[in-house]
C-alpha cells in the first residue's frame, strides 16, 4: 500500500527548527516521513532523528522513506503523548535539539476509506489512529449518553446543531446500531435544517472532526505532550507545533504564553518574590501559515498553523 502524505509547512518548519548538522531531532508524528526526511537532509555526522507514530501503517511508510539514512533514524511506535517516556528510554532527556508535532489526521488516513475518517466515502465507523485502541467512533456513538455526544460535537466540532444531531443519533441507534460512515452522514443531513446545510462546507465536516478528536483523545494527548516535549529539549532547543483547528491552536498558544512568563508576583510588589523566570522564548509572535501556492497544491495546508518556541532553561 502506498502511503500518500504531503508534509505541510515544510519550509516554515525548517526555518524555525534551524537543524544543526550534528543535532538530535524528534518528530512526534512522523507519518509518511516527509518532515523527517527534510530534517535529515540538513544533518551530518552524529545528527539523527527519532520518529514516533501510533499508526503502524504510517511507521512502516516512514521506515521505507527513511531507509537510506540508516542508523541515523530511530522509529518508535508510540503516541506523541508519551514523548517523555520514549526520550527517557533512549537516555536523551534534556538533550533533544528540536521537536516537531504535526497534529491531526494525515492525507493517507483520510484517503484510506476503511479507516472511517472521511465523510466522503462509505466505510466502517472507526476513526482510530491506533488500530489497536478499544474505542471506535461506532462504539462511542452507540454507547455514549445523548448529552455526552452533544458535548463532544459542540466542544470539539464547534457544531451549532450538536444537540439536534445527538438526538437524531440516539433515535436512530434505538432501531439499529450505527456502523457505517454513510449512515452517520445521512443522520446529520436529516438533523441539520436545509438552509443551514448550505453553510460552511459539507454538513458532516464538524461532526466527523469532533468524533475523531474524541476517539483519539487528541486534545488530551496534546496537553500531555507539550510539557513533556519541553522537558525533553536541551537549552536552546526548539519546539514546533502544527495545528489544524482553533482548539489545538489555543492550547499551544496558551502553553507557550504560560511558559514565556516571568515574574508571577502581584504588580504592586516592589521586588520579585516568586523567583519565576521564563522557560521559553516565543519564536512565532503570530502563527505561520502556508503560502497561497502551497494551499492550492495541498488543501490540508489551508487550515495549518505553526507555532514555535525556544527553550531557555
Curated annotation (Swiss-Prot):
Any GO BP annotation: rRNA base methylation
Pfam families, alphabetized: Methyltransf_5 (PF01795)
Aminoacyl-tRNA synthetase found in the keyword field: no
Top EC class of this enzyme: transferase
Record region (Disordered): 291-313
Main location per the UniProt record: cytoplasm
Reactions catalysed, as given in the entry: cytidine(1402) in 16S rRNA + S-adenosyl-L-methionine = N(4)-methylcytidine(1402) in 16S rRNA + S-adenosyl-L-homocysteine + H(+)
Binding site residues for S-adenosyl-L-methionine: 33-35, 53, 80, 102, 109
Cystine bridges: none
Keywords assigned: Cytoplasm, Methyltransferase, rRNA processing, S-adenosyl-L-methionine, Transferase
HAMAP family listed in its UniProt record: 16SrRNA_methyltr_H
Annotated protein name in UniProt: Ribosomal RNA small subunit methyltransferase H
Organism, scientific name: Heliobacterium modesticaldum (strain ATCC 51547 / Ice1)
